[in-house]
UniProtKB/Swiss-Prot annotation:
GO MF annotation: an example: glutaminyl-peptide cyclotransferase activity
Residues engaged in binding substrate: V12, F13, G14, Y15, G16, S17
Active-site residues, record numbering mapped to chain: E105 (proton acceptor)
Top enzyme class: lyase
UniProt catalytic activity: glutathione = L-cysteinylglycine + 5-oxo-L-proline
Family, per entry: Belongs to the gamma-glutamylcyclotransferase family. ChaC subfamily.
Any one biological process term the GO annotation gives: cellular detoxification
Subcellular location: Cytoplasm; Nucleus
Protein name per Swiss-Prot or TrEMBL: Glutathione-specific gamma-glutamylcyclotransferase
UniProt keyword annotations, A-Z: Cytoplasm, Lyase, Nucleus
C-alpha cells in the first residue's frame, strides 16, 4: 500500500525479540502475520542467549513444506501463518537500520522479502515486501528437535550477552497473547508451559 510505504522506506517483520525490542527509528508498526512458515526454537544461540560452550535456543522460521520433513510435524498442529509485528523505517534511516539488523542477526540468519497480512483469511497482503531474517536449515546453528522437555531444559538454564534464554521465550509468549485476538502459536505456548514447570521444580 502506497500510503503505508513512502518512497525509500523499509519495512521489517519481527517474529521474535524484534517484537518487544524493535529496530531503532521506526515510526509506525502493524500487528500482522506471514503465510507458509512455522516458528520454532530451532536455532542455537552462542551469543545473545547462550555461549559457545552452553548455547541457548532462539527462533527461526521454517517454510511449511520443509518443516513437514521433520518429526514434530506429525503431531504438531499447523497454525496458518506466523504472527509478529511489522515496523516501518523512514527512508533517511533505512540503510542505517538495515546495517544494524544485519549485525544483530549475524549468527546464522539470512535476509528475505515476504508479504505480510493483517487478518487470518486475507488473500491480499497489507504489505507486499517486508524484510525478515530467517535462520535456514543449512545454517550450522540449525538444531531441529521434537523433544519439548529437552528444549525447555536448555532454555531454562542458558544465558548470553542479551540475558536469560527463558526471558526471550516468556517475552515472546506475552507479546503473542496481546498482538491480536487472532494471534497464537501452539509451539511457543507449550514450550513456555514446560519451561515454567521445570523452573518451578528447581526453586
Amino acid at each position: 500500500m502506497k500510503t503505508l510505504s513512502p518512497e525509500g522506506s523499509l519495512w521489517v517483520f519481527g517474529y521474535g525479540s524484534l517484537i518487544w525490542h524493535p529496530p531503532p527509528h521506526y515510526d509506525y508498526s502493524i500487528p500482522c502475520f506471514i503465510k507458509g512458515y512455522v516458528r520454532r526454537f530451532w536455532m542455537r544461540s552462542e551469543d545473545h542467549r547462550g555461549t559457545v560452550n552452553s548455547p541457548g535456543l532462539v527462533l527461526t522460521l521454517i517454510p511449511y513444506e520443509e518443516w513437514k520433513q521433520f518429526s514434530d510435524w506429525s503431531f504438531t498442529p499447523f497454525d496458518e501463518g506466523c504472527w509478529g509485528m511489522a515496523f516501518r523505517i523512514p527512508a533517511k534511516y533505512a540503510t542505517q537500520v538495515r546495517e544494524y539488523l544485519d549485525d544483530r542477526e549475524v549468527n546464522g540468519y539470512t535476509a528475505h522479502s515476504v508479504p505480510v497480512y493483517a487478518h487470518t483469511g486475507d488473500e491480499i497482503p497489507v504489505l507486499e515486501n517486508c524484510l525478515v531474517y530467517v535462520g535456514t536449515s543449512k545454517s550450522p546453528q540449525f538444531q531441529p528437535s521434537d523433544d519439548l522437555t529437552q528444549m525447555a531444559k536448555i532454555i531454562s538454564t542458558r544465558r548470553g550477552k542479551s540475558g536469560d534464554n527463558f526471558v526471550y521465550l516468556f517475552e515472546l509468549a506475552k507479546c503473542l497473547r496481546h498482538l491480536s485476538p487472532e494471534s497464537k502459536d501452539i509451539h511457543v505456548f507449550e514450550l513456555e508451559a514446560e519451561v515454567r514447570k521445570q523452573m518451578q521444580k528447581t526453586r
